[in-house]
């Protein structure tokens, strides 16, 4: 099975990562030396296709004149993410985040901040589509992502294995900035925009935190809130690793 990557940056990041890119199509009127050089080095065939053809191939995702065909996204297991962590693991789990832009932005932040991986549900949630890859600026191609059938069961299993499960909820009493470093490792759980954490998912959390807000606005976009919380979590885990 294959998937489509749309846009210069996502295609470049795919070639820089471990993604198997099969073909690259570009507009004949434009040149892409960085993509051409990388494709030639990896033996990836390139061909021209007009804008209408690229629009159809990308299924409406903005492509900047570059579309690639790659092998299906390779998910991993949560246990694999933990096993490859160099220090106390830091992961983010997403509870029914359905908006591709939010998912892509969260993946980009997680990769940039050095989190070990992400966990997303198989159902009632956005998948790793061309729109998500583009929204992540290609960060999906560098991320370790597990896709699970039952998020609640996965969180329970991770908690039993020793990780601390930290939920993010605007109504919580504890400020995320007040978390202490955890030598066990942590999983940050972020809910969907509007709905937040589902009740059963919230019950699986060992602790629930909020982001302190001082201004006149009373809410944050889901991806922005996730980025702030991930920064705090990653900083705490870095401190725990250094202390160890």
Predicted regions and their residues:
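Short, hinge-like loop/turn segments at secondary-structure boundaries
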Residues: 64-67, 134-139, 182-186
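Active-site/ligand-binding-proximal alpha/beta "capping" segment
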Residues: 166-221
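RNA substrate-binding interface of SAM-dependent RNA methyltransferases
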Residues: 12, 16, 20, 30-31, ...
């Amino acid at each position: 099975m294959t998937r489509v990557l749309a846009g210069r940056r996502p295609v470049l990041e795919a070639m820089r990562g471990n993604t198997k890119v099969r073909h690259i199509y570009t507009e004949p009127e434009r040149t892409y030396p960085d993509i051409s050089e990388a494709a030639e080095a990896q033996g990836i065939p390139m061909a021209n296709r007009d804008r209408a053809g690229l629009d159809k191939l990308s299924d409406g995702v903005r492509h900047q004149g570059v579309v690639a065909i790659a092998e299906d996204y390779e998910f991993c297991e949560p246990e694999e993410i933990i096993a490859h962590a160099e220090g106390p693991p830091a992961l983010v789990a997403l509870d029914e985040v359905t908006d591709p832009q939010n998912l892509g932005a969260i993946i980009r932040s997680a990769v940039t901040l050095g989190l070990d991986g992400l966990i997303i549900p198989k159902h009632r949630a956005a998948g790793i589509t061309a729109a998500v890859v583009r929204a992540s600026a290609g960060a999906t191609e560098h991320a370790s992502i597990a896709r699970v059938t039952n998020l609640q069961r996965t969180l329970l299993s991770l908690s039993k294995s020793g990780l601390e499960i930290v939920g993010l909820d605007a109504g919580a009493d504890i400020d995320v900035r007040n978390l202490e470093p955890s030598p066990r490792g942590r999983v940050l759980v972020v809910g969907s925009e509007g709905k937040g954490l589902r009740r059963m998912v919230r019950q699986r959390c060992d602790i629930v935190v909020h982001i302190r807000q001082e201004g006149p606005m009373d809410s944050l976009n889901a991806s922005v809130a996730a980025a702030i919380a991930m920064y705090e979590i990653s900083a705490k885990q870095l401190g725990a690793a250094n202390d160890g």
